[in-house]
Swiss-Prot record:
BP term (GO), one: translation
Alphabetized PANTHER family for the sequence: 30S RIBOSOMAL PROTEIN S18, SMALL RIBOSOMAL SUBUNIT PROTEIN BS18M
UniProt function note: Binds as a heterodimer with protein bS6 to the central domain of the 16S rRNA, where it helps stabilize the platform of the 30S subunit.
Native organism: Flavobacterium psychrophilum (strain ATCC 49511 / DSM 21280 / CIP 103535 / JIP02/86)
GO molecular function: small ribosomal subunit rRNA binding; structural constituent of ribosome
Listed Pfam families: Ribosomal_S18 (PF01084)
Designated name of the protein: Small ribosomal subunit protein bS18
Subunit-level organization: Part of the 30S ribosomal subunit. Forms a tight heterodimer with protein bS6.
Annotated GO CC locations: cytosolic small ribosomal subunit
Keyword rRNA-binding: yes
Record keywords, A-Z: Ribonucleoprotein, Ribosomal protein, RNA-binding, rRNA-binding
Family: Belongs to the bacterial ribosomal protein bS18 family.
InterPro entries with a match to the protein in the record: Ribosomal_bS18 (IPR001648), Ribosomal_bS18_sf (IPR036870)
Length: 98
């Protein structure tokens, strides 16, 4: 087979197939809001160790799809993190926070 026929058939060694379906595992466990589970009503901005669970290594607030928090508590977490940053309990940016 010539290289032209191999490229047309798509059976060349080491060839990447772009139209093949990816094996995406959609059976992941559902994430639940830890605040609803524990019954936490108030998120304390002075507890920086607890708030570090909701920021990444650079100090950015993690999105809901990664943390699993509900919309109501995600807003409260973001307000608490912003207050903690303003009062210097947490840094605004960091190279490696954790």
């Amino acid at each position: 087979m010539s290289t032209l026929q191999q490229s047309a058939s798509g059976k060349k060694d080491g060839d990447i197939r772009y139209l093949t379906p990816l094996n995406i595992d959609t059976n992941k466990t559902k994430k639940y809001c830890r605040f609803k589970k524990s019954g936490i009503k108030y998120i304390d901005y002075k507890d920086a160790d607890f708030l570090l669970k909701f920021v990444n290594e650079q100090g950015k607030i993690l999105p809901r799809r990664l943390t699993g928090t509900s919309l109501k508590y995600q807003r409260k977490v973001s307000v608490a993190v912003k207050r903690a940053r303003h009062l210097a309990f947490m840094p605004y940016v960091a190279d490696l926070l954790k």
